[in-house]
Amino acid sequence: MMEESGIETTPPSTPPPSTIGTSVPAATTAISTPVPPIFSSPLAAPVFSPLPSFAQPIFSTPLPSSVPPLRTSVPLTYAPPLPVTGVHSPPAHTSVPAAFSSPLPAFSSPPSFPPPPLNTTPGPVLTAPPTGPPVGGFSMSSHYDITKGHAGRAPQTPLMPTYSAAPVTVLPNPVIQAPLAGSGSSITFPEEPEDSRVHTMHVDGSAGGIWGFFKGVAGNPMVKSVLDKTKHSMETVITTLDPGMASYIRTGGEMDIVVTSVKEVKVAAVREAFQEVFGMAVVTGEDGQSNIAPQPVGYAAGLKGAQERIDSLRRSGMIHEKQPAVSVENFIAELLPDKWFDIGCVIIDDPTHGIRLETFTQATPVPLEYVQQAQNLTPQDYNLRWSGLSVTVGEVLERSLAHVCRTDWHVAFTGMSRRQMIYSAAKALAGMYKQRLPPRIL
């Protein structure tokens, strides 16, 4: 394959860097000491002579067949290639003699550079390239087979650079770092200085426990306002879906009212009015006696009958003498000549706070003939004739008109029920009563 003139007939492909500048005796396969990339030994391989114009070989590309083969700077004789193995054996000598006893012939010219020092340390073992991205410089390593790469043979794999990551130096953080207890991670986080104000607030908040926390939140005016609005909204939804739930939801609190009647038309109207004004109120009914005529005539008789109902309950012990009570009494009055009206008197009596208030419902017109019938049905010697009639206007209307109830005939004449009339008056009464109560009661 080689001629005596030293002309190379092998393909002009660049051998791997492991063969560049390597001077090995017959028993030595590798040199572990790193050498310069261009000229590393006085002995050059017979198959390659690096060009002096390149500072460092970066890539090796096979030359086309049209390019003439490279010549070595010194005529060399052919030497059989040394087998390349993955295991490096220690060199036989620690210094380079002037002449070798190996079959390789000596150069006829002196070397241009001094020989590199050799040591006895085994060379590094070739490792696979790292999986990470290139960080530092790179080095090329490969195995080269001279039997391949000819025309018609197996193609030669071009040399690819393999990268090695340079060691990264981690500078210490000047911020104080707190060690992580019970964790195997090396990540540390800066420790922030504690705020004494936050610590004081935490201690003060935890001094009262969970109840102290709720007490503090409930005492906040803004929180209380939000809670009240939320509660009112929920009550509105519930009472809209089921109006009968209003009395159960709003029953409670310090406001306790007794109505001097067991009729639902009166008790329900007063309860709804006071719960609307005070939010929470307990309203119950007791049957009180008016001790006047069943159909009072005139304002004085109506007011007398309402007050007598309260007094009768207190005399009988049905309610406490200091118990606030509300009484409703309907009467008729001739406000204009031959014009009669039905009116309801609503009063509240609170002996504890010395409050006594009166109001009246709207006036409902009553036809004159029905009032005259009630007067004719009342005996002349009726003992309570001074206060009114023995027959009510409702009884007369019930006898005279179909589908009319004696207790709620107002809706047939006005389209507005008696309960609505009492509710309107009772709500106005509750508003006046609330204004006169001491603030601690509210």
From Swiss-Prot:
Gene Ontology MF terms: protein kinase A regulatory subunit binding
Pfam families in UniProt: NTPase_I-T
UniProt keyword Membrane, yes or no: no
Keywords of this entry: Golgi apparatus
Compartments, record wording: Golgi apparatus
Entries under InterPro entries matching the protein: ITPase-like_fam (IPR029001), NTPase/PRRC1 (IPR026533), PRRC1 (IPR026534)
GO biological process, one term: epithelial structure maintenance
Region annotation (Disordered) ranges: 1-27
An annotated GO cellular component: Golgi apparatus
Family the UniProt entry places it in: Belongs to the PRRC1 family.
PANTHER family assigned to the protein according to its UniProt record, in alphabetical order: PROTEIN PRRC1
Protein name, entry field: Protein PRRC1-A
